[in-house]
């Protein structure tokens, strides 16, 4: 894994688009609309990677975007594109290169050899953020497991780099390589042992969480899960509805643990008590290592009676963020649960056309602002309706 030190490192950002050829003339108007949409999504994609990179205290430099017919199996991009990356590294003084697309261990080694610069991908950045953000024992275990599983196939990268630094004197290269291979094998065994141990510990925590769930499920209180894209305001909403202290911060992946709090709702003269659980935020192309490691936390959504899907109204790609959330929920087999879409941060929207578009596109959604309290009573009413209807 790439660990930053006290000195701020500068990162060159690389994006690749698979190009399948020009659109036919019979679809010119349609392709024009698609191109406009694609351009907007590319801008959002670049902003998101920049934000992720800044979260691990790297300084993002310029972004290079390449269109490729297909991925080069050796270096992902073509030789001419590789030269442009090398030129940008030299001109901008980049310390490392960050690819937005997934980079295999083999391609990563080849790129580092060709560019003589550290190369990481978006998955590694996200895993590093999770490792930095982990606070509780459960989150630390899960983040460490994801980190080790990601690092395992990349071990040879360390030793290739070390061998290049040593150079190897004439007549000693064979012995040096043999020692390196021996050390590499020892490291692999050690890592496998650590991964096995961590998996057992994570499973133990998972069982404990399962027992806690059983206790909650056996009670008479309905359970809701707050889900959504990272930094949409999920923890702030839980804090506002429950009145309890919940850790909140305006950062990506500020919450990695499933926090559960009591919430009291009023229906007529009767008080209803429910349990609401905050969950880890989603992001597009979340590394599978993290999905596997944090499955016990994500399962809180799968076992809930209903879902509150929180969206950030001010996010330029809110519809795409909502689709990412729905995709993850589908993977967890809970997309058919009763759900409420809560569009948060409405106090940040001042454009009348944007407001109208949100109302037309999501007529069933509740427009809220955790900051001002706007729409929270309406949200509580929706929750109450779900609970009464579900009885």
Curated annotation (Swiss-Prot):
Mg(2+) binds at residues 235, 255. InterPro entries: G_HFLX_dom, GTP-bd, GTP-bd_M, GTPase_HflX, GTPase_HflX_N, GTPase_HflX_N_sf, P-loop_NTPase, Small_GTP-bd. Its cofactor is Mg(2+). Residues 162-181 are annotated as: Disordered. Pfam families: GTP-bdg_M, GTP-bdg_N, MMR_HSR1. GTP binds at residues 228-235, 253-257, 278-281, 344-347, 369-371. The gene is hflX. The lineage of its organism: Bacteria, Pseudomonadati, Spirochaetota, Spirochaetia, Spirochaetales. Its main location: cytoplasm. Monomer. Associates with the 50S ribosomal subunit. PROSITE patterns: G_HFLX (PS51705). This is GTPase HflX. It is found in: Cytoplasm. It comes from Treponema denticola (strain ATCC 35405 / DSM 14222 / CIP 103919 / JCM 8153 / KCTC 15104). GO terms for molecular function: GTP binding; GTPase activity; metal ion binding; ribosome binding. GTPase that associates with the 50S ribosomal subunit and may have a role during protein synthesis or ribosome biogenesis. GO terms for cellular component: cytoplasm. Residues 222-391 form the Hflx-type G domain. Keywords: Cytoplasm, GTP-binding, Magnesium, Metal-binding, Nucleotide-binding. Belongs to the TRAFAC class OBG-HflX-like GTPase superfamily. HflX GTPase family.
């Amino acid at each position: 894994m790439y660990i930053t030190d006290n000195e701020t490192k500068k990162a060159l950002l690389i994006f690749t688009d698979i190009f399948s050829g020009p659109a036919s003339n019979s679809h010119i108007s349609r392709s024009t609309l698609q191109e406009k949409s694609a351009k907007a999504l590319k801008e959002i994609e670049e902003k998101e990677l920049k934000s992720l990179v800044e979260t691990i205290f790297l300084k993002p430099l310029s972004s290079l975007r390449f269109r490729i017919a297909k991925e080069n199996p050796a270096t992902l991009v073509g030789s001419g594109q590789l030269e442009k990356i090398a030129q940008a590294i030299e001109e901008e003084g980049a310390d490392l290169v960050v690819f937005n697309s997934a980079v295999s261990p083999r391609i990563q080694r080849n790129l580092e050899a060709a560019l003589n610069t550290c190369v990481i991908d978006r998955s590694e950045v996200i895993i590093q953020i999770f490792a930095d953000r982990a606070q509780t024992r459960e989150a630390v275990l899960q983040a460490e497991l994801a980190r080790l599983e990601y690092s395992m196939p990349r071990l040879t990268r360390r030793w290739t780099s070390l061998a290049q630094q040593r150079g190897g004197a004439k007549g000693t290269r064979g012995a040096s390589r043999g020692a390196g291979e021996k050390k590499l094998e020892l490291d692999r065994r050690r890592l496998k042992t650590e991964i096995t141990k961590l998996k057992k510990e994570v499973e133990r925590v998972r069982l404990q969480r399962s027992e806690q769930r059983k206790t909650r499920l056996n009670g008479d209180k309905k359970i809701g899960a707050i889900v959504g894209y990272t930094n949409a305001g999920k923890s702030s909403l839980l804090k506002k509805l429950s009145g309890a202290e919940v850790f909140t911060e305006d950062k990506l992946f500020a919450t990695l643990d499933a926090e559960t709090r009591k919430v009291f709702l009023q229906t007529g003269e009767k008080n209803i008590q429910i349990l609401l659980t905050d969950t880890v935020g989603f992001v597009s192309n979340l590394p599978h290592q993290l999905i596997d490691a944090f499955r016990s936390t994500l399962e809180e959504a799968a076992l809930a009676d209903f879902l509150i899907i929180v969206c950030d109204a001010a996010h330029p790609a809110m519809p795409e963020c909502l689709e990412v959330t729905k995709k993850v929920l589908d993977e967890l087999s809970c997309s058919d649960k009763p759900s409420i879409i809560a569009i948060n941060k409405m106090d940040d929207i001042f454009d009348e056309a944007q407001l109208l578009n949100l109302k037309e596109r999501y007529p069933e959604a509740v427009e809220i602002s955790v900051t001002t309290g706007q729409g929270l009573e309406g949200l509580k009413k929706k929750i109450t309706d779900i609970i009464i209807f579900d009885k």
